[in-house]
Amino acid sequence: PPAVREKMKLASEAAILCPSSVGQYSVSTYLDNFDWRLQIEEFRGMYRGRRDAMVSALGEFMPTCTWNVPAGGFYVWVGLPDGLDAKDMLPRAVTNLVAYVSGTAFYAGGSAGHDHVRLSFCYPEPVEIREGVRRLSEVVAHDLELINLFGPFRARPTEGVSAPAPDQI
């Protein structure tokens, strides 16, 4: 249940605020005995290929969007076309077997970031990245088609909405 999940998440975060001495010693030993600089270069090449696969797929499948080309890290920020809302679109994306983080997750409140998604190219192989972007493009195209047919969606106020407390779910 959500209430238990949230408590487990907090416990996990509290448990790993500081790595254990054993963990720190293991990392120290690794750094002393292995060519970690070479490994970093290999990782940089791998992530560069994945980043390039994502940027290429965005250019091919999502030309109505904007995006950054990161010089580091493994996330691409994608700006959605006018009228689309990343948070509202997420359930349809998940149904189409692709996920992202809505830009709203990176702001303290309000609707800031609603028109952006953060895509990760850390784990999937380039062929999977391409397929994920293609699937996301289907969701974007579908939502744009709905906006073109019916106009932009405006949520109604939710005054008087009541819901059970998290620990009652």
List the predicted regions and their residue ranges.
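Conserved core segment of the aminotransferase class I/II
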Residues: P1-G45
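Residue-level recognition of strand-loop junctions within catalytic nucleotide-signaling folds
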Residues: P1-P2, D32, G79-P81, C122-P124
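Conserved glycine-rich beta-strand-loop-beta hairpin in the small C-terminal domain of fold type I
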Residues: Q24, S28, E41, G45-V55, ...
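PLP-dependent enzyme catalytic core of the Aspartate aminotransferase-like
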Residues: T95-N96, A108-I169
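Short, conserved charged micro-motifs
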Residues: L84-M89, V127-E131
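Residue-level detector of anion-binding/catalytic polar loops
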Residues: A99
